[in-house]
Swiss-Prot record:
Family: Belongs to the histidinol dehydrogenase family.
Binding site for Zn(2+): Q259, H262, D361, H420
UniProt keyword terms in alphabetical order: Amino-acid biosynthesis, Histidine biosynthesis, Metal-binding, NAD, Oxidoreductase, Plasmid, Zinc
Task of the protein: Catalyzes the sequential NAD-dependent oxidations of L-histidinol to L-histidinaldehyde and then to L-histidine.
Protein name per Swiss-Prot or TrEMBL: Histidinol dehydrogenase
Source organism per UniProt: Ruegeria pomeroyi (strain ATCC 700808 / DSM 15171 / DSS-3) (Silicibacter pomeroyi)
Length: 433
């Protein structure tokens, strides 16, 4: 049974604080193992990757077979039924159109001293995407990671997808093809992250690594950060639904279960201003759990981390939402835009009764790679910006240097950086001499 909280009860603040602080992820301490794997890949390259892949995925590879060939991808893609292909192509088109609008503009201007200033944006040269493997892997994650990279202008995009016992989801390869992925490698785990970061004879290194993974992948991403950029270290999925009584309890129950079925550590929370409606939703969840295919997972998540919170009004709901800073926030209320204006911390907001979070997972257009564990307080979901870097530009004319150079020389002397100051002063002396 989930927790039932009421903001009007005297112990509410204590209970709510405990809900916020609940540890939902039992991460094993794998750092030492991961450090060893990374060191091995750095030292032995392909040989280490091949050996580790055979040990963990039970697949015997050679340097030549690490990468899927064009023919292998084409053969797998041909197996995808037309309806699934059409759905992927629709999703890809919408994701691409949305992310194209995110592209920032370069800037270039001349200020009142005559100095020319500005910035330009450029993509990283190469990016690597990790895709959890097997037949249960998620092609939508390929689209959500790969398309922004390609829209940003990344020249080379490589994917690492483990193939346990030689199994791969053809939809993953189709998603890679649709997204414009350049290379697909049949490797996984910390060894894949190490290979992407440091390179081997077969796998050229990348500049940025994105994509979800298990504890070993997360630990590897932490360790290679600095050598390469990473997107984020994502935790278990979460959803917060703010709903009034003018909703179908079954719809809201399904929205809550849409995240609960991801992981036993996922969290689904309902905030409502109607206690009876909250109870009706909880009953609808229980009813759906009787038949849901992933009821074993969803049931544990709902029991251990689910919550129904009753508040006095929607202003209070917005305030609590900002404290939760959820990954996904659904606003199933009569005026969702007004409520959205008061909710400033959320990975993604879904407005109105006809915008279930699952639309955002697949075909809405915005990215589904989102900050978890309250990190929406300070971070954003994946976008083209994750694959871009801004370079500042400046050009001084003689007049501009005369105008601002003396201040630079003075500040350099104040910081006891003699050569800094002299590099400016030497030019000023010639201009003024």
């Amino acid at each position: 049974m989930p927790q039932f909280l009421d903001s009007r009860q005297p112990d509410f603040e204590t209970a709510f604080t405990a809900l916020l602080g609940a540890k939902r992820e039992d991460s094993p301490d794998v750092d030492a193992v991961v450090a060893g794997i990374i060191a091995d890949v750095r030292a032995r390259g392909d040989a280490a990757v091949i050996e580790l892949t055979e040990r963990f995925d039970r697949v015997a590879l050679t340097p030549q077979s690490l990468r899927f060939s064009t023919e292998e991808i084409a053969q797998a893609v041909d197996e995808v039924p037309a309806p699934e292909r059409a759905a992927l192509e629709l999703a890809a088109a919408r994701i691409r159109a949305y992310h194209e609008r995110q592209m920032p503009q370069d800037a270039d201007w001349t200020d009142d001293t005559g100095a020319r200033l500005g910035w330009r944006w450029s993509a990283v040269s190469a990016a690597g995407l990790y895709v959890p493997g097997g037949l249960a892997s998620y092609p939508s994650s390929v689209l959500m990671n790969a398309i922004p990279a390609k829209v940003a202008g990344v020249g080379r995009l490589a994917i690492a997808v483990p193939t346990p016992d030689g199994q791969v989801n053809p939809l993953v390869l189709l998603a890679a093809q649709i997204s414009g992925v350049d290379e697909v490698y049949r490797i996984g785990g910390a060894q894949a992250i190490a290979a992407l970061a440091y390179g081997t004879d077969t796998i050229a290194p990348v500049d940025k690594i994105t994509g979800p993974g298990n504890a070993f992948v997360a630990a590897a991403k932490r360790r290679v950060f600095g050598k390469v950029g990473i997107d984020m270290i994502a935790g278990p999925s979460e959803i917060l639904v703010i709903a009034d009584r003018d909703n179908d309890p079954d719809w809201i129950a399904l929205d809550l279960l849409s995240q609960a079925e991801h992981d036993e550590s996922a969290q689904s929370i309902l905030i409502t201003d109607d206690a009876a409606f909250g109870r009706a939703v909880a009953e609808a969840v229980d009813k759906r759990l009787e038949t849901l295919e992933r009821r074993a997972i969803a049931g544990v998540s709902w029991r251990d981390f689910g919550a129904v919170i009753t508040v006095s009004d929607l202003d209070e709901a917005a305030a609590l939402s900002n404290r939760i800073a959820p990954e996904h926030l659904e606003l199933c209320v009569s005026d969702p835009e007004a409520l959205a204006a008061r909710t400033i911390h959320a990975g993604a907001i879904f407005l109105g009764q006809y915008t279930p979070e699952a639309i955002g997972d697949y075909v809405g257009g915005p990215n589904h790679v989102l900050p978890t564990a309250r990190s929406a307080r300070f971070s954003s979901g994946l976008s083209v910006m994750d694959f871009l870097k801004r370079t500042t530009m400046s050009r001084m004319t003689p007049e501009a240097l005369r105008a601002i150079g003396p201040a630079a020389a003075q500040l350099a002397r104040s910081e006891s950086l003699e050569a800094h100051g002299l590099s400016v002063q030497a030019r000023l002396d010639r201009l003024n001499g």
